[in-house]
Swiss-Prot record:
Post-translational modifications: Phosphorylated on tyrosine residues upon stimulation by FGF2 or NGFB. Phosphorylated by ULK2 (in vitro). Phosphorylated on tyrosine residues by activated ALK and FGFR1. Phosphorylated on tyrosine residues upon activation of FGFR2 and FGFR3. Phosphorylated on threonine residues by MAP kinases; this inhibits tyrosine phosphorylation, and thereby down-regulates FRS2-mediated activation of MAP kinases. Ubiquitinated when tyrosine phosphorylated and in a complex with GRB2. The unphosphorylated form is not subject to ubiquitination.
Record function comment: Adapter protein that links activated FGR and NGF receptors to downstream signaling pathways. Plays an important role in the activation of MAP kinases and in the phosphorylation of PIK3R1, the regulatory subunit of phosphatidylinositol 3-kinase, in response to ligand-mediated activation of FGFR1. Modulates signaling via SHC1 by competing for a common binding site on NTRK1.
Pfam families, per database record: IRS
Keywords: Lipoprotein, Membrane, Myristate, Phosphoprotein, Ubl conjugation
Phenotype for Y196F: Abolishes tyrosine phosphorylation and interactions with GRB2 and PTPN11
Protein name according to UniProt: Fibroblast growth factor receptor substrate 2
Residue ranges, compositional bias (Polar residues): 325-341
Domain spans labelled IRS-type PTB: 13-115
Length: 508
């Protein structure tokens, strides 16, 4: 960089100027190299000197900055005008300069990005650091400690601050900048970090928070936390709620129509059963639905793994379905509104109503169409005209009976589908037939005894699977004779254009 000379405006700038400060550039040994005026604008840091133009450092390119008594220093990045380097300046108002720069950083929400560095102990003595000036490429690169634990930077004119393409990252010996915690308003407290459902440690973290607003259905005393919990209210009577929490908003949705139908069905089934099974359900803990290590051990008979199933589950296709919906009526009742008992970190996007599917049926032959069984009504209000495994419906806790895979296409022509149907029916092939022509060439090319083509009276099968012997055969010799006759015709019919290149061609 070279040494800095005295600034021409040194005497004209008052000592108490708001954003201009008189500074003296120093090296790492504290030797004064030159004086100047440091100005802080809204976007950049400017140093005015006498024998050169002003030097500017944009705030976004500053890696760190700090001060110690009467010394202000900062580190610039590669994108600055001076390139990568560390600069130190003596200033009687170093603290004011630092506070003003920090305030500008906060007002503009500028976050100084720190790279992963090697931590250095704060009790490092000056004897451990060589006193000679050095560049960042020197293996013994270190930083002289200041009373506040942050390193003293090389001078403005030191070789270490000179931009060079050979310079490695100075961050290899970097420490967090002065006032870093207060400088970065974008840092979020740990309690405000978004935690998603099915994350390990969510339940334990929420148990340790006393200030978290617990929803009414999950509000239990400490004495009752170790005892089996019961459902606070009937899920059918629960209304949608919006709960405000310090970490976000939770939407508690009511049961879907499909869940209401299943709950009514379970109530009717439980009326005819022994009430002992209902009392035994109170001795089991509720499944929170979290796929974490904190899930408590519950007998597999009374525990149900709840999932939002995409597509209907078929008992006959157990190897394809994803949800395990094989449990007793007691566990179904416990988990029928399982999502309402969950305690997610933020928004609860569950129990969404199912969407109508888009059918894409394949064409069936007449034999398959006639062998299909009676039509089965759908559980979600739509026609089961297709294979249920190809219906991408967001259906929750719905089990399709084994007869649901039987499809009736014969009745489908008479009813109007309630959803989009891209099945374009082709006309029936009952009255269509294709007659092939057979030409017998055993007689050779004898023109005196022409062969009469034979037309078969019996139609061929609709879908031939192998080659047949009845194909149209081309007479090669007759075709060649017709071709030669065509070539013998005059080529000039009066429409072709005559040029000097083809005017000598005479008609044949």
């Amino acid at each position: 960089m070279g040494s800095c000379c005295s600034c021409p405006d040194k005497d004209t700038v008052p000592d108490n100027h708001r954003n201009k400060f008189k500074v003296i550039n120093v090296d790492d040994d504290g030797n004064e190299l030159g004086s100047g005026v440091m100005e802080l604008t809204d976007t950049e840091l400017i140093l005015y000197t006498r024998k050169r133009d002003s030097v500017k450092w944009h705030y976004l390119c500053l890696r760190r900055y700090g001060y110690d008594s009467n010394l202000f220093s900062f580190e610039s990045g590669r994108r600055c005008q001076t390139g990568q380097g560390i600069f130190a300046f003596k200033c009687a108002r170093a603290e004011e300069l630092f506070n003003m720069l920090q305030e500008i950083m906060q007002n503009n929400s500028i976050n100084v990005v720190e790279e992963p560095v090697v931590e250095r102990s704060s009790h490092q003595t000056e004897l451990e650091v060589p006193r000679t000036p050095r560049t960042p490429t020197t293996p013994g690169l270190g930083a002289q400690n200041l009373p506040n634990g942050y390193p003293r930077y090389p001078s403005f004119g030191d070789a270490s601050s000179h931009p060079s393409s050979r310079h490695p990252s100075v961050g290899s010996a970097r420490l967090p900048s002065v006032g870093e915690e207060s400088t970065h308003p974008l840092l979020v407290a740990e309690e405000q970090v978004h935690t998603y459902v099915n994350t390990t440690g969510v339940q334990e973290e929420r148990k340790n928070r006393a200030s978290v607003h617990v929803p009414p259905e999950a509000r239990v005393s400490n004495a009752e936390s170790n005892t089996p919990k019961e459902e606070p209210s009937n899920p059918e009577d629960r209304d949608p709620q919006v709960l405000l929490k310090p970490e976000g908003v939770r939407f508690v949705l009511g049961p879907t129509p499909v869940q209401k139908q299943l709950m009514e069905k379970e109530k009717l089934e439980q009326l005819g059963k022994d009430p002992v099974s209902g009392s035994g359900a109170g001795n089991t803990e509720w499944d929170t639905g979290y796929d974490s290590d904190e899930r408590r051990d519950v007998p597999p008979v009374n525990k149900l793994v709840y999932e939002n199933i995409n597509g209907l589950s078929i008992p006959s296709a157990s190897g394809v379905r994803r949800g395990r919906l094989t449990s007793t009526s007691t566990s179904d009742t416990q988990n029928i509104n399982n999502s309402a008992q969950r305690r997610p970190a933020l928004l609860n996007y569950e129990n969404l109503p199912s969407l109508p599917p888009v059918w894409e049926a394949r064409k069936l032959s007449r034999d398959e169409d006639d062998n299909l069984g009676p039509k089965t009504p759908s559980l979600n209000g739509y026609h089961n005209n297709l294979d249920p495994m190809h219906n991408y419906v967001n259906t929750e806790n719905v089990t399709v009976p084994a007869s649901a895979h039987k499809i009736d296409y014969s009745k489908r022509r008479d009813c109007t589908p309630t959803v989009f149907n891209f099945d374009i029916r082709r006309p029936s092939l009952e009255h269509r037939q294709l007659n092939y022509i057979q030409v017998d060439l055993e007689g050779g090319s004898d023109s005196d005894n022409p062969q009469t083509p034979k037309t078969p009276t019996t139609p061929l099968p609709q879908t031939p699977t192998r080659r047949t012997e009845l194909y149209a055969v081309i007479d090669i010799e007759r075709t060649a004779a017709m071709s030669n006759l065509q070539k013998a015709l005059p080529r000039d019919d009066g429409t072709s254009r005559k040029t000097r290149h083809n005017s000598t061609d005479l008609p044949m």
